[in-house]
Amino acid sequence: MQAAPRAGCGAALLLWIVSSCLCRAWTAPSTSQKCDEPLVSGLPHVAFSSSSSISGSYSPGYAKINKRGGAGGWSPSDSDHYQWLQVDFGNRKQISAIATQGRYSSSDWVTQYRMLYSDTGRNWKPYHQDGNIWAFPGNINSDGVVRHELQHPIIARYVRIVPLDWNGEGRIGLRIEVYGCSYWADVINFDGHVVLPYRFRNKKMKTLKDVIALNFKTSESEGVILHGEGQQGDYITLELKKAKLVLSLNLGSNQLGPIYGHTSVMTGSLLDDHHWHSVVIERQGRSINLTLDRSMQHFRTNGEFDYLDLDYEITFGGIPFSGKPSSSSRKNFKGCMESINYNGVNITDLARRKKLEPSNVGNLSFSCVEPYTVPVFFNATSYLEVPGRLNQDLFSVSFQFRTWNPNGLLVFSHFADNLGNVEIDLTESKVGVHINITQTKMSQIDISSGSGLNDGQWHEVRFLAKENFAILTIDGDEASAVRTNSPLQVKTGEKYFFGGFLNQMNNSSHSVLQPSFQGCMQLIQVDDQLVNLYEVAQRKPGSFANVSIDMCAIIDRCVPNHCEHGGKCSQTWDSFKCTCDETGYSGATCHNSIYEPSCEAYKHLGQTSNYYWIDPDGSGPLGPLKVYCNMTEDKVWTIVSHDLQMQTPVVGYNPEKYSVTQLVYSASMDQISAITDSAEYCEQYVSYFCKMSRLLNTPDGSPYTWWVGKANEKHYYWGGSGPGIQKCACGIERNCTDPKYYCNCDADYKQWRKDAGFLSYKDHLPVSQVVVGDTDRQGSEAKLSVGPLRCQGDRNYWNAASFPNPSSYLHFSTFQGETSADISFYFKTLTPWGVFLENMGKEDFIKLELKSATEVSFSFDVGNGPVEIVVRSPTPLNDDQWHRVTAERNVKQASLQVDRLPQQIRKAPTEGHTRLELYSQLFVGGAGGQQGFLGCIRSLRMNGVTLDLEERAKVTSGFISGCSGHCTSYGTNCENGGKCLERYHGYSCDCSNTAYDGTFCNKDVGAFFEEGMWLRYNFQAPATNARDSSSRVDNAPDQQNSHPDLAQEEIRFSFSTTKAPCILLYISSFTTDFLAVLVKPTGSLQIRYNLGGTREPYNIDVDHRNMANGQPHSVNITRHEKTIFLKLDHYPSVSYHLPSSSDTLFNSPKSLFLGKVIETGKIDQEIHKYNTPGFTGCLSRVQFNQIAPLKAALRQTNASAHVHIQGELVESNCGASPLTLSPMSSATDPWHLDHLDSASADFPYNPGQGQAIRNGVNRNSAIIGGVIAVVIFTILCTLVFLIRYMFRHKGTYHTNEAKGAESAESADAAIMNNDPNFTETIDESKKEWLI
């Protein structure tokens, strides 16, 4: 438990350093001594042995490097894969390198070999590298020496070399040298009963830092290695569970509170192989490093305490019996330990000198006792034949096996006298027995037992059969044994085949049901007799093929786990597979995020404002988070919510303790930091409502209130101010209520006051905590509001550099992507070649380049030889358009994709090097005299980290920061006539000459018209304000200054109405020319043209449908001289022709009217007839040539002075959804949420600290909000009935009422004028109420 102050931290640090040194000093040579001594050259002949020799002059004793004794080296009698050369060093050595040479001056040499090692000359272990049983490249001639440094040193007394391949024109010939140094360590043997305690001098041990190191080996899968506990609930336990290492730790829990300190971490696998494994536990407070066999796992303990409090002792080898359930339910350790060090104390040395008293009954010895089991290792082409006793009426076989494969043949044997056969196999992870009978009507008896037996653990199988009876038992569980009493006659045969069966070798026509077994077996018994595998190895009796006796070389390919981001690893014998479901990632190793890195990226995929999952660091460790992307402006806002309600009352303050308000965000602080770091600008609104509650205590006092931001730093400024300035917004603007103070609240008034504003220094954001004081006085009150974090822009997405000449390059630090690497970027160029990037190692390298105008190449070498993947494009890539390149390489495969072309994939070899080892700097744009890249690269990300090309270009001579020409690639995103404008970071769409609004000029701009309302657009702006809302009609300007005559025009608009007849659009002139679009009493559409030259206007009647049906309709009218094209909704365009006598010019256009025509002079009778009472409904997208009258009325544009409005114009989209870029299909769109409630769609990923809050609102808030919604709905329903009663005679169109409706011209105007919170436009697609 943590209770004491931090006294003694210096001593603890010294202990940390000393113990770290000591724990290594007992197990390794001094760091000043290079471990590279030749270990073979001085050995006598008797230290060498081999499988065979041609003769005495070829004996293994002559296999010393650079020696010519005898025949010049060792050569076996037969050159096959069963030969080996063995060296005994006399005692254990630390081995760091190996070298080989062929037999002197001959054609005999080995080209590939394996190295096995052992402490006893039994139970051999093959040398592993990069997760595989390693095959060393050998010699290419007889006298050259080939030396290999081991990737990690090994400790062994015996080394065995097994030739895999040799010179085809000669035979096996070998001379060797092994390099290393002496090794010594104290060893203790634990028999499973004895426990070794180390008792503390003061009966207690309170530590902030610990270092515990030891080596162990065992053939048991369960057992406690060390244990310590304290009376306050602290404990530490290191134990084996199912042959995996488990560290359990508790630094303290609070029984009465929410603090739960138990932490458990599992690592390793197959640790019951009776080979040495090293463990180091390093603890500093709650930070833990657990290292097993050079693989380190870092984690932090649960809870809030830092000290480990142990009482009396720490024990090794088990838990002393204390009467507690935990002490009797766990098995003690059975095996060997060496070099046990606890915080600098050499436990093994104390035990050897009898300074420690073992507890429990048992034997403690100081030499390692080896097991008597002999394992045998099978591969896909192996089998083991052992003899049996012929013609016995009892068939009995038992063995233990371990494997990763769910299927495989375990045992096969024929009965004597052709009675049938028995096959025992593994089928879908169960053991099955199939007895084929040839003498009875029943042809086969099948029984099975067990489940999940391909988990890599040892499992025991016992099968017994006799007349009319058989029983199958798994793992000694007699209660679950499977029996059968089917008719059966048994006479045992003379051969038993384990692991495989070859028909052609045994004159059998029987086909086994399963493929050969891949795994290990041991303790094989046939006819109740233990099989002597050493005799089988000498083929007396029995035989075998491709098996390794006295070795179990099973590999756990899921340790270490190459499946990233929580992917689940499953394996077979020679491969593994990652399941990435519900992780948010994809790919062979769950490396690639399925989400975009930012809202900016979603915008350019055509998405609209909504909730999205983003992954700011891509393939990095942070994971995805859910944010709201607001895309209604040119720059996208990313909004991260939290759980604090607006105007939350501040309670709980007293003079001794401040009130602390903690904000819980819908993402972790690391995730939010990734957003703020990449954003161009961030802000967060804060407000403090106060009544006799001071805020910052300005001008000179200590602040009563502060907020905590990123990195847990306190800040003493408020919204609207900046860092280092203890002021509020009013203090900056000098308009505080009392000018003596810098905050309104600091004046300490008894009336409610407010200090509010935006915090915009993004390096301090987000606000994670607000600490409030000064609310304890009589009458003091305060309310706190903190808005969501809002960030704008994405510096990473447009981060770019221009490469002005082929010899230019940018350099960065070495790329770290040993086992997993992903690279993505955009490029554009006019040249057909160039190196994008390159990083070199001693032999390894990685390179991406444009090889030709249509080819992109990804090449690399991890030690297995160069690999190149090429994507070929059907169209040139040097077209000055942006193209995206994505390359990935991991231990499973490598891939390359360009744009949306098919991805090219190359599988990695099942054996070989897997680590990409690079040493040089990373060069972007080419280096080393190669053909450099000429063009532009942007958004270069490597393993989730964006390289800052812009900043590096600024400090590199000859470079241009940023890129131009974005419109060449993205200009098509600007729709409806919008113009693409280049920006330093990207581009924008200019919608000023369109009837649309929004980022891509795809948002409708429309308005709702009530009866009698109208809009006039004068083609020449008058001198006075044309937007005066009076009903005055200005006199026409001088005709000489009117709009020029038109030989062609285009009119586009959308409308919806339920009233007919009405005028939709009317264009007048200073002559008699006009153009009108109207709805007739029947609801049909009519276009009337009068260009002069005809007695009557030319009419186009569209009679095939009722247009006054309340649905939105789009109209496009285009005239070129006498030809008119009309397109209505989705119908095909229809052409019409004006009479031959008609003029071709629209003379002197004057004004454009919407809703109603208010014009002086003579008006066409048909127009006059339909002009009353006027249009009621919605108009949008109205455009006449380059003029958008509605947009000019609703937006402050240069044309706004031309507009005059009668009535209150209320914006609406007329029920039409805004146009968007062509969306991706839902099948390929991982962020597609349309099938869910976008505000509540939850991804099953927990991004760190607790469960993510839906849209930043917790469950309690949702319940409160639901109750409030029900109350409001009830009130609104009551109001609707009251309004229906009060206005039952008026019959006009209404939307929601608001205060001040009596003085407003409409209910909608009342909402706009009186409700400051009203920000949404009226959506006519919603249900309309006719009152």
Swiss-Prot record:
Disulfide bonds join C35-C181, C336-C368, C520-C552, C558-C569, C563-C578, C580-C590, C936-C963, C967-C980, C974-C989, C991-C1001, C1178-C1214. Keywords: Autism, Autism spectrum disorder, Cell adhesion, Cell junction, Cell projection, Chromosomal rearrangement, Disulfide bond, EGF-like domain, Epilepsy, Glycoprotein, Intellectual disability, Membrane, Phosphoprotein, Repeat, Signal, Transmembrane, Transmembrane helix. It is a single-pass type I membrane protein. Predominantly expressed in nervous system. One of its GO terms (molecular function) is enzyme binding. One of its GO terms (biological process) is cell adhesion. Residues 28-1262 are extracellular. Residues 1026-1045 are annotated as: Disordered. The modification Phosphoserine is found at S1303, S1306. The keyword Glycoprotein applies. Residues 35-181 form the F5/8 type C domain. Belongs to the neurexin family. This is Contactin-associated protein-like 2. It comes from Homo sapiens.
